[in-house]
Amino acid sequence: MKKIAIFAKVHDPRCVGIAEELVEWLLARGLSPLVEPHLAKHISCSYTAKRDDIPEQADLVVVLGGDGTLISVARLVGDRQVPILGVNLGSLGFLTEITLTEMYPALERCLKGDYEVSERMMLRVSLHRGGAEIEGRQVLNDVVINKGALARIIDLETEVDGRYLTTFKADGLIISTPTGSTGYSLSANGPIIHPQLDCLVITPICPHTLTNRPIVVSGDALITISLQSVNEDVFLTLDGQVGFEVKHGDQIRIQRAERQTRLVQSRSKDYFEVLRTKLKWGER
């Protein structure tokens, strides 16, 4: 590994300061840091590259921040499959499981090739209108179709592999990966899914029919959702960060992406320890 990309929350002085220290650490070892211009101007770094070009150049990506920062970088990396080392400087940190004290030892191991990655499923999401695809993206956590604040409940006709499932009458619908099962889906009473399981979760948001419950389907499933409601404000949100308006008759198709996100794992904790810590299990 020679080229190490750094992404950080530029509005967090602590993240910016650590990014500056990391650049110096890399240079002292004869490595080439890659920093997007927006961050570079905060740390007086001349080793810049356009944000969209970084995944093609980097051998490793270091993310300083929280899960939100890592999720946005995972979408950017996309098919490139560069390993991502997430350093938790945020609050919750299900994905950024490397602590600040672990960062430099973890980097040393990565440079020696002595590291393990957790491969996480990503989704390919496309929005179709009038028979044509008008948007297509990859997501790591979840896809959410929900109504605006003043809209009534919406009707979402849902198929799995071309077979009719039901028409959800609800405030919305969440389709999550196992990684995303601890996000919005969990708040809507969805199950916690181990990230190595090969499945997707369909979770209704405040369904009108009380027997509508979250359902787990195959990771190879093609989920098709059609908006049947008329004159309602409805939105498609990807990973809680990118959004599009959905109109009557639009169709949303969701399936496994071709590539996975590769997250460098912590040596000091496992998935269940992360769950216990973040969800405060066993505390009184």
Curated annotation (Swiss-Prot):
EC primary class: transferase
Entry's Gene Ontology molecular function annotations: ATP binding; metal ion binding; NAD binding; NAD+ kinase activity
Disulfide bonds: none
Any Gene Ontology biological process: NADP biosynthetic process
Keywords: ATP-binding, Cytoplasm, Kinase, NAD, NADP, Nucleotide-binding, Transferase
Gene Ontology annotations for the cellular component aspect, listed alphabetically: cytoplasm
Reaction equation(s) it catalyzes: NAD(+) + ATP = ADP + NADP(+) + H(+)
The UniProt record lists the keyword Repeat: no
Essential cofactor(s): a divalent metal cation
Domain of life: Bacteria
Enzyme Commission number, as recorded: 2.7.1.23
Active-site residues annotated for this sequence: D67 (proton acceptor)
Localization (cell): Cytoplasm
Binding site for NAD(+): D67, G68, N141, D142, R152, K169, D171, T182, G183, Y184, S185, L186, S187, Q241
SUPFAM superfamilies to which the protein is assigned, alphabetical: NAD kinase/diacylglycerol kinase-like
PANTHER family the UniProt entry points to: NAD KINASE (PTHR20275:SF0)
Family recorded in the similarity comment: Belongs to the NAD kinase family.
Role, per record: Involved in the regulation of the intracellular balance of NAD and NADP, and is a key enzyme in the biosynthesis of NADP. Catalyzes specifically the phosphorylation on 2'-hydroxyl of the adenosine moiety of NAD to yield NADP.
Listed name of the protein: NAD kinase
Species assigned in the record: Geotalea daltonii (strain DSM 22248 / JCM 15807 / FRC-32)
Phylogenetic placement of the source organism: Bacteria, Pseudomonadati, Thermodesulfobacteriota, Desulfuromonadia, Geobacterales
Gene symbol of the encoding locus: nadK
